[in-house]
């Protein structure tokens, strides 16, 4: 189950990011922005017996994420598939960056395939760690994201910006091309140095 504060952040990003781009249809659902899940509702419930509030974010049903697909295919995608994925990754992240946000958790599990007529559309999801891009340089920033795909600057504690999302996309594509990351095959001593 997702951390409640990340669901609040995710809902806020969806609202701000897609506010002018989604329109309500006659059945009350939002029309989609290509490559971003439709959000149907977000709700904060009353405190439960443990005095914690529950948060609910309801979005459209999507297909498998790229982490699942990559492993189902024995860690092999064709070059053509990787190029098509790269094109859609860059389109999604360009939209996100133009809207003034950075994702901060780019990884295969946060890219999902559509279903039905959208089965070839890659969706970018999980905005629980996203934030407004302020381009403020800081060397004492708390680590946010997934270590395996995080940029070098993120590991060094430098505040994240658009470049870090792009570097993470590069690591994802490198893994799709070779089946692993370069640091997957190194010993613990070398990994620590990296």
Task: Explain the meaning of each model-derived region.
Residues 138-154:
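Conserved activation segment of eukaryotic-like protein kinases, specifically the C-terminal portion
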Residues 154-194:
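Conserved C-lobe activation region of Hanks-type protein kinase-like domains
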Residues 29-78:
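Conserved structural core of kinase catalytic domains
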Residues 1-16:
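ATP-binding glycine-rich loop module of kinase domains
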Residues 85-86:
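Activation segment signature within eukaryotic-like protein kinase domains
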Residues 123-126:
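Pre-DFG segment of protein kinase catalytic domains
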């Amino acid at each position: 189950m997702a951390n409640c504060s990340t669901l609040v952040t995710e809902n806020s990003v969806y609202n701000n990011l897609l506010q002018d781009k989604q329109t309500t249809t006659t059945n009350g659902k939002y029309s989609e922005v290509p490559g971003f899940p439709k959000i149907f509702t977000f709700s904060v419930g009353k405190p439960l017996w443990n005095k914690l509030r529950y948060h609910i974010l309801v979005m459209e049903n999507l297909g498998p994420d790229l982490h699942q697909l990559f492993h189902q295919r024995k860690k092999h995608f064709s070059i053509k598939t990787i190029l098509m994925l790269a094109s859609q990754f860059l389109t999604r992240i360009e939209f996100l960056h133009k809207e003034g946000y950075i994702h901060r958790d780019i990884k295969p599990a946060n890219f999902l395939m559509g279903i039905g007529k959208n089965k070839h559309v890659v969706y970018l999801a999980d905005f629980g760690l996203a934030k407004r891009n302020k381009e403020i340089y800081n060397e004492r920033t708390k680590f946010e994201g997934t270590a395996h795909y995080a940029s070098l600057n993120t590991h060094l504690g430098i505040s994240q910006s658009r470049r870090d999302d792009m570097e993470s996309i590069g690591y994802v594509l490198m893994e799709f091309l070779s089946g692993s990351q370069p640091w997957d095959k190194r010993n613990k001593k070398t990994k620590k140095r990296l």
